[in-house]
Amino acid sequence: MTMKALLSTAALAVTLGGLSAATPAMAQTPIALGNLVDYSGPTNDVGTPYGQGVVDTYAWINKNGGVNGAKVNLDTVDYGYQVPRAIAQYKKWSGADKVAAILGWGTADTEALTGFLAEDKIPDVSASYAAALSDPTGAGGKAKPAPYNFFYGPSYSDAVRGMLTWAADDWKAKGKTGKPKFVHMGANHPYPNAPKAAGEAIAAELGFELLTPIVFALTPGDYSAQCLTLKSSGANYAYLGNTAGSNISVLNACKAAGVDVQFLGNVWGMDENAAKAAGAAADGVVFPLRTAVAWGGNAPGMKTVMEISKMSDPSGTTYRPVHYIAGVCSALYMKEAVEWAAKNGGATGENVKKGFYQKANWVPAGMEGVCNASTWTEKDHRGTLKVDLYRMKVAGATDAPLNDLIKNGGIKLEKVKTIDLPRKADWLGW
């Protein structure tokens, strides 16, 4: 072999060796995700456990090898439920150091960002379940296209439809006659208002008499006046559109006023912490659960949830409310979509979006019996139309630690019914 050939062979070997050595390093390039949370604003009561669920999940993912060997850099930012702060943060996440995807929070900010997400091709798995975020193409005609928006669980609108379907049957089962009366309650804000029209439409369809909506703020306060209005209206079923924090104030005020009504909470409207705070006033509230079980439930996937929880509670003794587990499920759906993207062209926003369409009746690995199966398609981002209804049961004083109250049955979640809604085209995006 000539000297020239030897040198060429050596050079090729060095090049191949260099590429071989570089490959693992390239595979380890961190994957950036944004995580918008409310730890300090008016929805922090439910935002804190949900956000902790997301943070713990990615800490656990990184501890167990990351995504295809790559670490996830989760940038968690508390925006205090302020839309301008959310938009300012989004500009950073869509800038030079662009994130592959975002785990979002509120309705007002998520809807404000929908067009930007589509333009910048950044998927957003939000904690807003506004139906307007579920129509990727705009074909439903009720909302603007939201091709990069996803959420885990039934939409606010579908949850109301499920609860009112149950309420109509409940009215008959109790032997009541005449039209039951329904009222929408909540702040005059995009989040509580999101399912208002859809709820009132199906209520009318089901034979309810619609009452004038009752407005109360997103923050705790004295809502005695609202409860007196509710009492005098003769309402039989009342939808609580706010988060648990302000709902507690309403429940307590209405109990004091002697209001006899069946409260229907939205998905953020009730949890174990709220039941402890409200005590007997929370007894009987019906609300939807996004997961198949609550904390400590009998399911194979609960072992995974318990391990994830230890990332911020090494002792494993903290009771996690329903919102924490929903945060875990949302984070793991995102993780698997990112994982698919990394294996199919790279973890870009476009590929992550495609990752959400790869499975039908999808439950994240290791979460069997915990996360309800979800299916997203390019034409329909309603991941599920199943609405699992539970009743909050409170017996006796609630001064003891939450763990003890749950163990002793002082607070418990009682399954009421599962409503499987039809996938109606005219409900898409509404």
Q: Predicted regions: what is each one?
A:
Residues 23-35, 63-71, 168-181:
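Immediate post-signal peptide segment of exported/extracytoplasmic ligand-binding proteins
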Residues 30, 45-52, 64-139, 152, ...:
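Beta-alpha junction/loop-to-helix N-cap segments that form part of ligand/metal-binding clefts
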Residues 311-324, 335-404:
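Segments of small-molecule ligand-sensing domains
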Residues 142, 300-320:
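The feature captures the short pre-catalytic strand/loop hairpin that immediately precedes
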Residues 99-211, 262-287, 293:
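Extracytoplasmic ligand/sensor domains, especially the bilobed periplasmic-binding protein
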Residues 30-55, 77-84, 106-107, 185-194, ...:
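Extracytoplasmic "Venus flytrap"
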Residues 1-27:
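Gram-negative bacterial Sec-dependent N-terminal signal peptides
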Residues 43-67, 197-205:
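Short, polar/charged alpha-helical segment
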